[in-house]
Amino acid sequence: MDKQEKSLIINEFKKSENDTGSTEVQVALLTARIHQLTTHMIANKHDFHTKRSLLTLVGRRRRLLSYMRNNNGAGYQELIANLGLRK
């Protein structure tokens, strides 16, 4: 993910002008990175280092989503709808 792609994601999910670290932004950035690593893993099945990194990112996103579900239920529902994470 390059700087331009990252800034587009931040601009889409930020809450205020200087927001770069809110839970929504973090989850959106992690989701983009997870999608990149998933496509890499399809092409490179034996890349175990990347597989471990992918599982770490998925766990981090899961914890952030759990935090958000417990503290901001409406924002959680909106975020997963925007990212298309759950049905």
From Swiss-Prot:
The keyword Chloroplast does not apply. One of its GO terms (cellular component) is cytosolic small ribosomal subunit. GO terms for molecular function: rRNA binding; structural constituent of ribosome. Keywords: Ribonucleoprotein, Ribosomal protein, RNA-binding, rRNA-binding. SUPFAM superfamilies: S15/NS1 RNA-binding domain (SSF47060). One of its GO terms (biological process) is translation. InterPro entries: Ribosomal_uS15 (IPR000589), Ribosomal_uS15_bac-type (IPR005290), uS15_NS1_RNA-bd_sf (IPR009068). One of the primary rRNA binding proteins, it binds directly to 16S rRNA where it helps nucleate assembly of the platform of the 30S subunit by binding and bridging several RNA helices of the 16S rRNA. Forms an intersubunit bridge (bridge B4) with the 23S rRNA of the 50S subunit in the ribosome. Belongs to the universal ribosomal protein uS15 family. Part of the 30S ribosomal subunit. Forms a bridge to the 50S subunit in the 70S ribosome, contacting the 23S rRNA. This is Small ribosomal subunit protein uS15. It comes from Dehalococcoides mccartyi (strain ATCC BAA-2266 / KCTC 15142 / 195). The gene is rpsO.
